[in-house]
Amino acid sequence: VKNLDARQSIQIIARALLQKDLTDTEAAMRIAFLSRQVTATEAELKQFTVFQQLAEATAYIPILDDWAMLEKSEKKRLNRERTTIEAKYSEFIQAGAQQLINIKLS
């Protein structure tokens, strides 16, 4: 059940990313977390890698309450850094998301 739930969530997040409802970083953090709950094939492990790499590259950026407490100027600076990092991964993230919307649900 956990494997199936994680796979369905990955599919939903990948779809939301392709529809631009999430940033690459937000999708990467969520997919990287969920990928640890999936019994993955070799091919799926390769698809998850780019999401894990982007999540690690942006892990220092505060989220949720920690983000809310930042000064406006700090948020702007971190957003610029995030978009610069995302640009390096974007092509691979988009291609990975395209693959993950078809992830096997069994």
Question: What do these predicted ranges mean?
Answer:
Residues 1-106:
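Acidic, Ser/Pro/Thr-rich low-complexity regulatory regions
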